[in-house]
């Protein structure tokens, strides 16, 4: 009997031990996560290559206005922006830079010392003219330069702009906010198209210009089909009159009055700064006054603050202003 009891006791101990192993927490038996599975790690691709960060970044210095706008579009305030005064003058959007945002010089020549004082997590700009600054900026923090100059980016500036928005959103952990902003723009284009069609305009062909005076001489930036502006207006049901130009790096050609005459049988949609006397100076210009869109009252003001090189918030301003101008 004593032997039987001893055997039963040994069997019970073995059974309890097996059950304890079965109930062990999963993290004691699971494989260790690989480096690629590290929680929170972010890899983004910019115009120069890949960058890996340990998670969403918080202190961002935007040395290009588009970057500042992209951050605002996803609900993030940059630590600093180049030429804040210029941004506020030229970029009319429904989000504002906070008063705490530091001005760090010009886009073409950022103040390196001021940026260093801010101890940013990342400095974000664009390829092209800002690449020359890379060696100095990289001494301060990692630098991301969004693609703006590749053949692919130039061929479709609208698509490139959305890609750059998504990159910035990924950098700060705001991907859902970026997609919501893109959807909002697409919905507004469709809504505006319906309203413009109902307006029964004389034509749906357009020329869009950012015009300005240079030494009292009028100059017109005419936006080509590869531009963000053209894509948005075509999304509103309009057709770009300019079809005879190659893709330009910034999506426009520069013309004088004689150059504009090549596209005169169209809606002439313009953005001009309020303090620019351009149209006043043109009032006595016979060549200007004889243009089809002048004679037939087909000139439409898109407002003075449309940033024609902007991101989704500028697109919304463009849609709203053009829709109002064409349908009132």
Which role does the model predict for each range below?
Residues 160-163, 262-328:
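Structured C-terminal subdomain patch of bacterial secreted/periplasmic proteins
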Residues 46-48, 103-112, 247-257:
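Short helix-initiation/N-cap motifs at beta->coil->alpha
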Residues 140-214, 312-328:
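Extracytoplasmic substrate-binding proteins
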């Amino acid at each position: 009997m004593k032997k039987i009891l001893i055997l039963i006791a040994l069997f019970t101990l073995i059974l309890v031990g097996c059950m304890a192993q079965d109930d062990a927490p999963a993290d004691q038996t699971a494989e260790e996560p690989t480096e690629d599975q590290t929680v929170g790690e972010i890899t983004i691709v910019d115009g120069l290559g890949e960058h890996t960060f340990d998670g969403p970044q918080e202190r961002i210095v935007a040395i290009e206005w588009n970057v500042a706008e992209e951050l605002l579009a996803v609900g993030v305030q940059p630590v600093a922006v180049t030429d804040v005064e210029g941004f506020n003058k030229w970029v009319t959007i429904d989000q504002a830079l906070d008063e705490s945002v530091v001005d760090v010089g010009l886009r073409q020549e950022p103040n390196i010392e001021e940026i260093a004082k801010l101890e940013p997590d990342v400095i974000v700009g664009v390829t092209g003219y800002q690449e020359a600054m890379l060696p100095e900026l990289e001494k301060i923090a990692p630098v991301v330069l969004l693609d703006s100059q590749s053949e692919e980016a130039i061929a479709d500036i609208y698509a490139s702009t959305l890609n750059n928005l998504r990159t910035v959103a990924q950098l700060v952990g705001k991907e859902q906010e970026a997609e919501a902003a893109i959807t909002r723009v697409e919905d507004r284009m469709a809504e505006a198209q319906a309203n413009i069609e109902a307006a029964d305009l004389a034509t749906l062909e357009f020329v869009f210009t950012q015009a300005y005076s240079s030494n009292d001489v009028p100059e017109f930036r005419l936006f080509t089909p590869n531009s963000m502006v053209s894509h948005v207006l075509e999304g509103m049901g309009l057709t770009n009159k300019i079809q005879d130009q190659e893709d330009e790096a910034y999506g426009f050609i520069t013309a004088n009055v004689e150059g504009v005459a090549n596209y005169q049988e169209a809606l002439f949609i313009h953005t001009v700064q309020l303090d620019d006397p351009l149209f006043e100076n043109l009032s006595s210009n016979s060549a200007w006054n004889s243009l089809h869109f002048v004679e037939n009252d087909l000139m439409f003001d898109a407002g003075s603050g449309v940033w024609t090189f902007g991101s989704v918030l500028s697109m919304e301003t463009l849609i709203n202003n053009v829709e109002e101008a064409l349908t009132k």
